[in-house]
């Protein structure tokens, strides 16, 4: 009987440690809003290269029946979202002739990457 109590105690201690670590970890889904942040790879001292980073909104909802009937490939869920993109930028040359966009303003807009 003591044999089972020992393993039960070890199990409970392990479970409580796991739950403590789980609740003390930061929330992974927390994402900062869309802002300019320095790109450490391309930036040089005195000449920072900025890029837009952060989160905007996204949502999913059931596809309305009226819309579903017009689809070639019907899907049950429709989603829409916006991405953090540059509102304005300057083209600059860095590190041996590479041209990059140095963002000057950001906003949430259409996700062009996901468009087909």
From Swiss-Prot:
Q: Which InterPro entries match?
A: Cystine-knot_cytokine, Glyco_hormone
Q: Any idea where this protein resides?
A: Secreted
Broad class of the protein's primary localization:
secreted
Q: Which GO terms describe its biological process?
A: follicle-stimulating hormone secretion; follicle-stimulating hormone signaling pathway; G protein-coupled receptor signaling pathway; hormone-mediated signaling pathway; luteinizing hormone secretion; negative regulation of organ growth; organ growth; positive regulation of cell migration
> Which keywords label this protein?
Disulfide bond, Glycoprotein, Hormone, Secreted, Signal
The domain of life for this entry's organism is Eukaryota
Signal sequence span is: 1-24
Keyword Disulfide bond set for record = yes
Q: Which residues are glycosylated?
A: 76, 102
The entry's stated outcome for residue 76 to D is: Increases from 1 to 3 the number of FSH binding a single FSHR receptor
Spell out the GO cellular component terms annotated for this protein, sorted alphabetically and separated by semicolons. Answer: extracellular region; extracellular space; follicle-stimulating hormone complex; Golgi lumen; pituitary gonadotropin complex
Indicate yes or no for the key word Glycoprotein. yes
* Physiological role: Shared alpha chain of the active heterodimeric glycoprotein hormones thyrotropin/thyroid stimulating hormone/TSH, lutropin/luteinizing hormone/LH, follitropin/follicle stimulating hormone/FSH and choriogonadotropin/CG. These hormones bind specific receptors on target cells that in turn activate downstream signaling pathways.
UniProt lists the family membership as follows: Belongs to the glycoprotein hormones subunit alpha family.
The name of this protein is Glycoprotein hormones alpha chain
Q: Which organism is it from?
A: Homo sapiens
Q: List the lineage, top down.
A: Eukaryota, Metazoa, Chordata, Craniata, Vertebrata
Q: Which gene encodes it?
A: CGA
